Amino acid sequence: MAGFTTPPQSGHLPSTSWDSSSNELLNKFFDSTVWSAKNNHADLPTDCPTRERHGWTGDAQIFCPTACWLFDYAAFARKYERDLCDAQRKNGCFTQIVPVGGVDSYMNAMNGSAGWSDAGVLIPWDIYAAYGDRRILEENYAAMCRYTRFKIGTLGKWYMTSLPTGVGPRHSKDIANYGQSYGEWAEPKDVKAFAISEFVCPHPEETTAYIVYLTEHMTKIAKLLGHIEDAREFSEAAKRVRDGYQHLVATKKHSLDTDRQAKLVRPLYMKLLNKPQTAYARKRLVQALDHYGWRLGTGFLSTPFILDVLAEINLDYAYRLLENEELPGWLCMPKQGATTIWENWEGPRAAAPASLNHYSKGAVCDWLFRVMCGIRVDGENHFAIAPRPGGHFTHAEAEYLSIYGRVASRWEKTADGITYTVTVPANCTVTLTLPGHPAQELTAGSYTF
């Protein structure tokens, strides 16, 4: 069949942003992200429109910050959070697919999986951070507390497929080695080959890390909503589980001396390590990237974090990885003609191709707005703009139609240096920080520096 067209199908998600740069492959990747997100947001955030079409919580969770840039997303996310709370188990566990059911209902043992079920807490926080509306936190606070206490309750427990961690009894009580989970998931095959044990065994490194991440988020949420005793409880849990994590990565089995980028990116992004461990992990991550030809070696959970981690070490490293066009990498997809985002890095070249319309890897677009162009909502009617030019880009720009109005940031390299252009919406202010210059306050209008 040929010669026919059909309109795209998606939920009602008004576009709220635009991004462009001198790198055409990155522009195509951004457009592909928008299309894949639209294809996968008909009433709920599905993983792909071509296979099981389930509401996978992990995909929704890692993409939420990007979705808040791309679309008017708050109402959609509030509805999905209600779905999560409706499906919450009596023990407090959020399910890993919402709504529950369908061909994958046999995977109920994966409920509570780190980075997936945590969506019930992380999505409300991301929506609050993007829009400043506390209602999603207030409406779901009790359910979020139940889930967090459920996760804390798994610490130190034994599971029938638990494997030894190498941590002694004093600190093993603060490590999560319980339940089935996905772990990092979908790392490149030459980094970490998939084994069936990935499904049936606990993943203590990933799960312990996410319990710290979870309890720290709940500490902030509890303080914001005035629940001081809850905040103290979650803060104390975060402190002791972080200590447990530091002992876990000091073992041979879970050592930071690894070429698996995810095992270094996660603790660096989540601030889980002590000072000596942090210094070592930073050096080891750069070494791991050297060994892998500065290609992307992270999996599902850590890919959205890696550019932030590299930018803290050296901004040039972040741009070097972003501009990589070889497989695995973000730009290898548009280079091969992709118009949507692939589930696996290999795309159609894989021996058994997976979905070719899977938006989750597009989560890196958050970095383009927030770091490359430097836009950040920083309170009611106020923004912070701190662009960080780099790499081989000659220009980059982004605009965001926020609930307060249109804000925009552009930079362009010229023979005389770098020119910056900023647009501030009516009745708003911006704290502008340009590289090498002190911060300055701007009122509504357009400015060029």
Please annotate each region the language model reported.
Residues 43-45, 102, 247, 282-289:
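Flexible, solvent-exposed coil segments and beta strand-coil junctions
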Residues 236, 240, 316, 320-449:
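Non-catalytic C-terminal accessory modules of carbohydrate-active enzymes
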Residues 2-32, 38, 45-97, 130-207, ...:
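Active-site acid/base region of carbohydrate-active enzymes
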Residues 57-68, 74-80, 114-126, 204-219, ...:
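Well-ordered alpha-helical segments within folded domains of soluble proteins
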Residues 105-108, 134, 183-201, 252, ...:
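Short beta-alpha connecting loops at secondary-structure transitions
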Residues 251-353:
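Extracellular polysaccharide-recognition and catalytic grooves
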Residues 93-106, 153-166, 246-257, 295-311, ...:
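Charged/polar, low-hydrophobicity segments characteristic of intrinsically disordered regions
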Residues 105-129, 135, 139:
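Thiamine diphosphate
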